[in-house]
Amino acid sequence: MALPMMIDCDPGHDDAIAMVLALASPELEVKAVTASAGNQTPEKTLRNVLRMLTLLNRPDIPVAGGAWKPLMRDLIIADNVHGESGLDGPSLPEPTFAPQNCTAVELMARVLRESQEPVTLVATGPQTNVALLLASHPELHAKIARIVIMGGAMGLGNWQPAAEFNIFVDPQAAEMVFQSGIPVVMAGLDVTHKAQILPADIERFRQIGNPVSTIVAELLDFFMAYHKDEKWGFDGAPLHDPCTIAWLLKPEIFTTIERWVGVETEGKYTQGMTVVDYYHLTGNRPNTTLMLDVDREAFVDLLAQRLAFYA
């Protein structure tokens, strides 16, 4: 039986590719997609969800837009990474269907209520919508099997020296998620920086030759440009968000550990830092499964295999 799940995302090139991977996988049943503000402004990320689902011919999946800003601060966006539209590069179709007449939290709550079994929630952007869901519907916590997030890191940042972008955008929301008591699986920079897509991989995807694989290659062409800056020291581009979906499909290609994680919400230099109790110094019980490593070749093979689904 397919795993019931929802995706909360802020497309974003890697969010879009995570959607492509999920919807090419019969092991997963995507019951809803909600949009968060992050990589771009909320109206743009919502439009990008609709554009991607139009490309993938999935107007049957309900969509809703979420919070317009983080819980306690102004919105920060990553237009320097993802461009003016949030999905710059390829020519994507205009949406052929409309979002639901409800908020992201209302849609997620409806899916949880109606599901006969617990639902996995994948969140590849800031955690604002997820935190609002948890705060407003404590009666539904038991219906959430796990929350799989892309965000954070054990020891480095990509937006601030100590903070990864998704967590830095809304650290208060992320802290609520980690301390919710619901199992969290974290794909942080420790693993996503090892899930790099190289130029040869992009050409492999392009050669698959269907409309979706071509769009994915063009998304990666644009995404690659930002990551060529020498400061990163990358050979390619880290494909952050698809690690969440890949873990659901093939957990055996990832190396993980169980640890307690908290989020620094106020630090002068460390606001947005995910604090990982690696040596069990706090006495807190582990609340998070952290991905630390990935078989890069197996990860790329999985993407290529699932892109062929769209032939």
Curated annotation (Swiss-Prot):
It comes from the Bacteria. Keywords: Glycosidase, Hydrolase. InterPro entries: I/U_nuclsd_hydro_CS (IPR015910), Inosine/uridine_hydrolase_dom (IPR001910), IUNH (IPR023186), Pyrim_hydro_RihA (IPR022975), Ribo_hydro-like (IPR036452). GO terms for cellular component: cytosol. Pfam families: IU_nuc_hydro. The keyword Hydrolase applies. Its EC number is 3.2.-.-. One of its GO terms (biological process) is nucleobase-containing small molecule interconversion. The active site is at H240. GO terms for molecular function: purine nucleosidase activity; uridine nucleosidase activity. PANTHER family: INOSINE-URIDINE PREFERRING NUCLEOSIDE HYDROLASE, URIDINE NUCLEOSIDASE. Belongs to the IUNH family. RihA subfamily. HAMAP family: Pyrim_hydro_RihA. Hydrolyzes cytidine or uridine to ribose and cytosine or uracil, respectively. NCBIfam families: PRK10443.1. This is Pyrimidine-specific ribonucleoside hydrolase RihA. The lineage of its organism: Bacteria, Pseudomonadati, Pseudomonadota, Gammaproteobacteria, Enterobacterales. The gene is rihA.
